[in-house]
Regions:
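Intrinsically disordered, low-complexity Ser/Thr/Pro-rich tracts
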Residues: 2-4, 23-24, 38, 50, ...
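Classical Sec-dependent N-terminal signal peptides that target proteins to the secretory pathway
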Residues: 2-22
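Generic hydrophobic-segment detector
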Residues: 7, 12, 27, 110, ...
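Short N-terminal segments immediately surrounding and downstream of signal-peptide cleavage
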Residues: 21-41
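Catalytic glycan-binding domains that act on GlcNAc-containing polysaccharides
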Residues: 41-279
């Protein structure tokens, strides 16, 4: 009898999962989303042209559940992405664009090395911008339940940008999560921080000047301080338990964990002068 119950339960979840991710169900989502988007001020023309062509992308769900930041320790993550080859490419990018990059670095007070490093990490200096249709990616993630509210908001923002001719809808290919351009900006980041640095009337985040200026503006707006180091060398009184290693910076900033970690760090006074871990 127990086996029968288990079979029924498993079958139910299989059927439920198949239904959630069926093409028919995604089509229903598109109809409902268009109604919602109209109320947000998106034009019917844009919705019919853009959303009607969107498709459900199963791979996007897989990528969302299996991100490198979730399962790779810090050393492995950095060693895979900070290679001598990338340093050579980065130096070449700077050599070919140093006037623009120096100007932007000075204007926004953001270290040029930081900007180049971010570009290298995000897109290998523009050599891999992503091949996913970000409209379909955002639609898939909006349809999915895990972070539907966030991605619905991002999709609405992107449609507003298209409606206002700020971004070109014919060139929207990027990451599985909907990020775009040399520095992988999400739609809300484009809306809030992107800069038309070359004054051509368009924001082109695949072009050097606009993308570097936008990234610099983003960092400046978030309060980046060139006088503070990116990393802090610490000395330990004793080993930190494994459960506290490789947690995100956001989690470390919680008051509870700061107080707990403090007893393990010998040179905590050194960190205090940078106001780190107490933000």
């Amino acid at each position: 009898m127990k086996k029968i119950k288990y079979i029924i339960v498993i079958t139910f979840f299989i059927l439920k999962s198949s239904y959630v991710y069926s093409d028919d169900n995604f089509d229903v989502w598109k109809i409902n989303f268009k109604k919602y988007a109209l109320k947000q001020g998106i034009s019917t023309q844009t919705l019919n042209r853009i959303i009607d062509k969107s498709i459900f992308l199963p791979d996007v769900i897989k990528y969302d559940r299996y991100q490198p930041e979730f399962y790779e320790d810090t050393k492995t993550y950095i060693s895979k992405r900070a290679t001598n080859k990338k340093i050579i490419i980065g130096n070449k990018i700077y050599k070919n664009n140093f006037k623009k990059i120096d100007k932007i670095s000075k204007e926004f007070n953001i270290d040029k090395s930081l900007l180049l490093s971010l570009m290298g990490i995000e897109t290998n200096f523009g050599n891999y911008l992503g091949k996913m249709d970000i409209i379909s990616s955002l639609a898939t993630l909006s349809f999915d339940k895990r972070r539907s509210e966030f991605f619905t908001s991002e999709l609405i923002t992107l449609l507003i940008l298209i409606d206002n001719n700020i971004v070109n809808s014919d060139n929207l290919f990027g990451s599985w999560a909907g990020a775009f351009g040399n520095f992988q900006f999400m739609p809300s980041t484009i809306k809030n921080y992107a800069v038309d640095s070359d004054k051509d009337g368009k924001i082109n985040l695949k072009e050097t000047e606009d993308s570097f200026a936008s990234a610099a503006n983003y960092l400046n707006s978030l309060g980046w301080d060139n006088t503070k180091p990116c990393f802090y060398k610490i000395e330990l009184n004793k080993d930190i338990p494994n459960s506290y290693l490789n947690v995100s910076a956001k989690k470390i900033h919680s008051t509870k964990k700061v107080k707990y970690l403090k007893k393990y760090i010998k040179n905590f006074n050194f960190l205090d002068k940078y106001d780190v871990l107490n933000a």
